[in-house]
Amino acid sequence: MNVINGKKIAQNLQASIKLKVDTLDRKPGLAVILVGDDDASEVYIRNKEDACKEVGFYLEIINRFDNISQEELLFEIERLNHDDKIDGILVQLPLPKHLDVNLVIETISPKKDVDGFHSENIGKLMQNKPFLHPCTPKGVMLMLESIEIDLVGKNCVVVGASNIVGRPMACELLNAKATVTICNSKTKNLSCKLIQADIVVVAVGIPKMIQSDWIKPGAIVIDVGINRLDNGCLVGDVDFESVRKVAGWIAPVPGGVGPMTIATLLKNTLTAYEARI
């Protein structure tokens, strides 16, 4: 078993981004909107703030109370759409229930949609003509690239069908000419599908759901899940200790996909910057 060190891969990617930024006349600009005071969201934003400082980006963090109206939030996004200092816009999810998440995402200019969630960017990904990739799936692809795996013809199973990870993950793998099966936590005989997979990507939000007897010996297992247990420990959707004894490669939680998501966000911001100059 080999561990895919997402933290190290992300550091290398961020170092290459910094080298590029050092040659630019203007720093790429990222705006992050945080609505409310969700503790987990604040941690994620601090991580993004640290990463932006590391690569030399301009960062604007906009904090709004959780009672902000839909109209006020959309007005803020439109302001950023027209701000020449800002190349990328990110609205930290989740949002309070009274806000329409889809409308918020669609209001962000697709040219500044560095999360890669706008329908225009998802459509380009489906056509295999991507511009700004959804960050987590692209981060997974970069992890697979780092171990020099040839995806052509590989049997891949994606467990989880969210718009943020599962669906775009399947598109990324299809674009790499892999054979892809999409499942979810309710899929019948899930273990039978997984045992045939060369590559497994899991994002369902169920702690330690995937067990070692579901995994083909030598398979590559990418755990996207982040779950905090009652004792405060962070674990993934894969039972790491048992699966590591079977898998050929495995991405751990923490230290796997998480750092790659942030690094890919920075990569998207640089791409958006370059498209505007």
Curated annotation (Swiss-Prot):
Question: A Gene Ontology CC term for this entry?
Answer: cytosol
Entry binding sites for NADP(+): 160-162, 185, 226
Please name every pair of cysteines joined by a disulfide bond in this record: none
- Subunit details for this protein? Homodimer.
Listed pathway(s): One-carbon metabolism; tetrahydrofolate interconversion
Q: Which E.C. number(s) belong to this protein?
A: 1.5.1.5, 3.5.4.9
Could you list this entry's UniProt keywords, alphabetically sorted. Amino-acid biosynthesis, Histidine biosynthesis, Hydrolase, Methionine biosynthesis, Multifunctional enzyme, NADP, One-carbon metabolism, Oxidoreductase, Purine biosynthesis
This chain is encoded by the gene named folD
**Example of a GO biological process term:** tetrahydrofolate interconversion
The record's comment on protein family reads: Belongs to the tetrahydrofolate dehydrogenase/cyclohydrolase family.
Q: What does this protein do?
A: Catalyzes the oxidation of 5,10-methylenetetrahydrofolate to 5,10-methenyltetrahydrofolate and then the hydrolysis of 5,10-methenyltetrahydrofolate to 10-formyltetrahydrofolate.
Q: Can you state which reaction this protein catalyses? A: (6R)-5,10-methylene-5,6,7,8-tetrahydrofolate + NADP(+) = (6R)-5,10-methenyltetrahydrofolate + NADPH; (6R)-5,10-methenyltetrahydrofolate + H2O = (6R)-10-formyltetrahydrofolate + H(+)
Q: What is this protein called?
A: Bifunctional protein FolD
Presence of keyword Zinc-finger: no
One MF term in GO for this entry?
methenyltetrahydrofolate cyclohydrolase activity
